[in-house]
A protein has these predicted regions:
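Polybasic, lysine-enriched low-complexity intrinsically disordered terminal tails
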Residues: 1-27
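Catalytic cores of DNA base-excision repair glycosylases
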Residues: 28-254
Length: 254
């Protein structure tokens, strides 16, 4: 399976404050929960659930991969990740490297001048807080506690924390939301028109069954993301070819 693009908001300049955490979400309206399930059931046959995981990185490596991928084509972030792996024997060596050297190594991604020091700072924070560059201990935590631990690090947002838990070998039941997933959910009316990507995470997770497995949530993210890439485009969505058209208020306006 081709590796899809994974996007998050652009990194904040160094020293900028993180946005405040979203308040805990109340139970969703029954009609929205039912609609979220209907969307899942309609899209799964189209995109082939269960969807294979696209790689199996340790959680620290997944953290680096996710930080590289922000607003960057997957092919470009993938090349940058491989370049870092080839240049540095371990992530400790990356932390110790000169910033301009790291920036040059990841030059193919967007904002390498921001991402190079950001990745080094995030890794240094992990090492300081965890006593080493190993996040395996997150497997013993509840998902929300693990996400809170990660998001306490400046530069790590909801999408990155969910990606580390879901996409890495931890395989924990967290729901990432990228820009494609977010756009489809917004057009379907699952989230409001002013709800940004970050705050949408707890809302969309609350609409899905609490007992869903890591694979179920991974599938939900993947099918909505793929649908956003292939059908529900940012411009000129292909509503006439959309299996969700009958339950999508935006399709009736197209």
């Amino acid at each position: 399976m081709a590796v899809p693009h994974r996007h998050e908001a652009p990194p904040r300049p160094r020293g900028a404050k993180a946005a405040p955490e979203a308040a805990p979400q109340a139970a969703p309206a029954p009609d929205l929960a039912a609609k979220a399930l209907a969307v899942h059931r309609l899209l799964c046959p189209v995109y082939g659930c269960p969807i294979p995981y696209f790689h199996a990185l340790d959680p620290v490596s997944e953290l680096v991969s996710s930080l590289l991928s922000h607003r960057t084509r997957n092919a470009d972030s993938g090349r940058a990740f491989k370049a870092l792996r080839a240049r540095y024997p371990d992530w400790a060596a990356l932390i110790a490297a000169p910033v301009p050297e790291v920036e040059a190594t990841i030059a193919g991604v967007t904002w390498p001048e921001l991402k190079a020091p950001r990745i080094q700072a995030v890794l240094a924070a992990v090492r300081e807080r965890a006593g080493g560059l190993d996040l395996g201990f997150l497997a013993g935590m509840e998902v929300e506690a693990a996400r809170a631990w990660l998001e306490a690090i400046p530069g790590v947002g909801p999408k990155t924390s969910a990606a580390v838990l879901s996409f890495s070998v931890l395989r924990m039941p967290a729901l990432p939301v990228d820009s494609h997933h977010h756009r489809v959910a917004q057009r379907l009316g699952l989230i409001g028109p002013r709800v940004d990507v970050g705050p949408s995470h707890p809302i969309l997770r609350a609409q899905l069954p609490a007992d869903w497995s890591a694979q179920d949530l991974y599938d939900n993210h993947e099918i909505l993301m793929l649908h956003g890439q292939r059908v529900c485009h940012h411009r000129n969505p292909a509503c006439g070819a959309c299996v969700l058209a009958e339950i999508c208020p935006s399709a009736r306006l197209a």
